Amino acid sequence: MVVSTVAVEKPSTADELARQLHDAASQKLAVVPVGGGRARGMGGVPERVDVELHTTRLDRVIEHSQADMVVSVEAGITLEALQHELAKSAQFLPLDPFSSPGHTIGGLLATGWTGPLRLRFGSPRDFLIGIRVALPDGTLASGGGRVVKNVSGYDMMKLHYGALGSLGVIVAASFKVFPKPLRDVTVTSEGGWDGADQALTMPVAPSALEIFSDGRVLARYTGSHDAVDRVIHDLGWAVEDQSIWERHSGRAPARWARIAAPRSGLRRLVEELPRGAGWWASPGIGVAHWAIASDAHSVIGMRAKAEAAGGTLVMLAAPDDFMREVGAWGNPPPTIEVMRRLRDAFDPDHVLNPGRYVV
């Protein structure tokens, strides 16, 4: 019997991580970057794993300028630790990903995971202002603001965001941060999709809006006292305890998928899910999450419907056999050839996360 041993590396500096990545790449060993491990089920089943390269010891706040509202951190810091630090200055990073707690900042950038607050603040890419990445050749490349060196010809922040560590390992990032709102109130109704439409058309837009398979709707309003109090009075929904969002962000089914579609078509797609399916959706964003309790055939069928509507169905977690049967990503995007050329340029031996990303 042959026993495969996976080496586990836990560097404490970016330079050390870059050296370890280069050492592995020079031996053509397959390297899997690991942050908090909260999204390890996302993507295809890795073809092989020789080295796990953990970032959790890269957990420092490098710089926080309260006046400039900018923070620079190492990639292994958890979102919770960063929020705790920012709260001392009445600031925050508007990230509330599912499968929390425990996400690292680097992991969130590599996966592109977001949460309900994306409705108001956008994705992390919208407030990411700088990034530093270790490449397989051992170099540390940077892009954006508060960095030392840019890689000519490439937008490093766009390249590495959501690329699942297939082009390099994120070691640090800088963000614009936001002041904590003066008022933060959540209200709820049983109004289903019509209730969600009502909340979206109020004079003050919600910062987050979620609808659930049982017809329940949550709307979160943030801002000045007068503006928030006026909109929740006019809406007339029941006030919900703010802890509901922490419980909501903890959702992490064993088998689940993210369905993204044009906002106008999201409701129709969700209504095509198998009867009795568990789901929740962000109608203002055009994203739904499906807790899968049906067979692979149902998932493949739903993906076809999503793609026909101009959307996607991406698996976020499933047992390996199920993932292989349905596929993680669906049909390749139109940019697949460009993505392959980039992969060949940054990682010519394909040592980073082989088999996991779409290329």
What name fits each language-model region?
Residues 2-31, 55-101, 113-144, 182-189:
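N-terminal glycine-rich flavin-associated loop
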Residues 12, 43-48, 56, 99-100, ...:
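Conserved glycine-rich FAD pyrophosphate-binding loop
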Residues 30, 94, 205-210, 276-280, ...:
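A short linear hydrophobic-aromatic micro-motif
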Residues 34-39:
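Glycine-rich beta-strand-to-loop/alpha-helix junction loops that act as flexible
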Residues 80-82, 192-196, 225-232, 265-273, ...:
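Short, conserved charged micro-motifs
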Residues 95-96, 100-207, 217, 221:
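FAD-binding subdomain of flavoenzyme oxidoreductases
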Residues 220, 224-240:
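Terminal amphipathic helices with adjacent charged low-complexity linkers/tails
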